């Protein structure tokens, strides 16, 4: 049911009659006449009836709207408010029910599954910048009424701060506290006097400030001023307490140098106070796991210690004078303004981190022995060994060796050493705890071998007798403790303090009331033998003799054992055991008065360094020579073991050529430049013919194919020669080639009288009438020779005949094979005459076709006679290749000095037009010898275009067009032009055809 407000003015405010429901008005017209039933007519003036009636009608109309939306007669209702922020609509995070302490559940807080993290709830460091910005001119919708507004995180934190200011109900708080405490103060008795609330509140304040910062809304709530006040109060309290600790002597916060130099009277008084109480016996801890660990920043709990029978009783300090640890790190972190809460092991905000638990150092400097002031603090903390003396800064005056371990260092040295030992030594129990059970030597082998320790009694035994007695051993012991003991507790050196983290469950206490245990069962003969070996090894290292074997001029060093103990569960040899070690080391030489060998060795340093440099330089040179010899030997071995992939049966073997590279190693590796070119007397060129195929194995070798002609440069040795082939020089085996006797032109020429077809690669095919150069005679039936294109092979001796004299006429017998290029007699007689030389001219500047040779033969155009410089003779002795140059038809005749080769595929004979024949004229009326012209025309080599390159077909190729050239394997092609698209233009020697062919099908020959 819907209740409307009073629309009839202020006169209806005190009306006691109940309003009738608006549902009784069925139509607006009835409301105008029956409004007196709704309210009494005498309670409002007639002047307001119209306005009241209008409001009633409007209300009824709004109620009857089918959509239920806001009408134009009243203000629209505010839109529903979405409680979920825009950034968290698609976010899934860990949200526990109710308020969650961020310190106890921080391992689950802010675990974002998808999307960002809400900075209002989850402490993820500094919130985004948009969180701290204030949006201006932003109208927020009215909040719907609620019974009780929920508490925000800021209010919850404020309530927590206000609640923490109250005094705790119990004097000691549990380990798991719900607040972030700088360091655990629950076990600190000084916080039981009403100081815990300040520490607790300051912890929360520092945590809030470090987490949110001043710019966040959390830091701006109403309790910010009180937080500042509490924090300042805590800092003031801390500074006052620090000043009190400096003035008093109950904590080691005072200057350590002043405590070290305390007078003996105060030490005696403090020592007498220890006789009041005596701790109850307690069994030693058997393992590091059952020992109670002390968190970093805690006060070491007072443990009851077992008292040996031979020790004088002593009493611990009172509760007010209990020793506290030096926690400089935590105090400095807390003093900083707005710094994060210092680390505490009691809080749970370190999940997922790995941090070594720190153990405080309990140092009692207020109750030192009377002889403590006379003993050097450096010896107390670092020992008097040789290594420790080198680590420290040199003193103003060098004491004698006997008094070195008992002299007082400077005040600065003692202060620095005290702070160093306070920051390096870590332990878990205080000085009143009983010593643990010593461990076996096998468990500490790594430490004992690297940092051996020994009894402080041995600090003086080098100057005494071989077997020290109890009387001599009691003197240095009395300097540390007021009692006389047979054996002193092992002391740790400064080096061994760095490895004490391995056994941190054992006590390390520096004070006048140190307990001296009995000899450990670990002091076995095997242990003594190990220590002797270590001392012997160190002695040899420090007294290394020179190369001459003498030890004169060098002072012997002795590693003075340390007199500071390390409580890592093992004991070292006693004075008697070290005495036996001294006998083994055989100290028979005189010991100097002071250990100055380290400084004396610096005087001889430059000479030794110079000698060392000379030795290193000499050894380096020898090493380089040795490496070079090994490299050469390895190369020789590889060359000796190398096998060729193709070795003919008749070829000599290279496997036994052991010394074929001896001279090569010196010739090719030497840096000596060859002399410049001189005027040598011309000598005939020596050539060789490759008989077998040779594949190179290095860049210095020259590849050879069978039949290659090599120009010999020099003879390397009896097995290798250096030569040149096709512009490439290199070495090759002598047994793979045959030396040509005499020049190439003087070789015997032979003519093939019968055609011969080769049946193997070693044979040479012959064509009838082909000129062959004879090389050698294989046997009575076979000869070896090369044809005019350089192919070498064997052929029957009966198929050729020697050429004794030059023919006097042009032969009429020509090879039957039409593939061999030649010139017909008719064409020759028509164009060329024996007694004259003709040229061809063209009015257009181009050469025209003078004749077409039938049967795909070659037509030659003689050079122009207009240029006398380009006239060529037909005498082969004057010009070896007169008509071999090929040019394109676009060149002008004045610049064209070579003949032109054209080919016709159609077998049609054309007559030369008269106009062209008239252009021929005589150049020379002198008769020429027709015999020489016949030799040139019949020589197939004369058909090779001048300037062309010879290629050999590697793959067969079938032409696809008319202008393409057919190729067979091993065909010889003379290439005259190379196109950019990879196609070559040339002439096939086998067919005489001219055309184009793919360039990747041929190889340079």
UniProtKB/Swiss-Prot annotation:
Residues 544-557 have a biased composition (Basic and acidic residues). Residues 11-25, 260-269, 392-409, 559-589 have a biased composition (Polar residues). Residues 499-567 form the SoHo domain. It is found in: Cell junction, Adherens junction; Cell membrane; Cell junction, Focal adhesion. Residues 683-742, 745-805, 946-1005 form the SH3 domain. Residues 610-642 form a coiled coil. This is Sorbin and SH3 domain-containing protein 1 homolog. It comes from the Eukaryota.
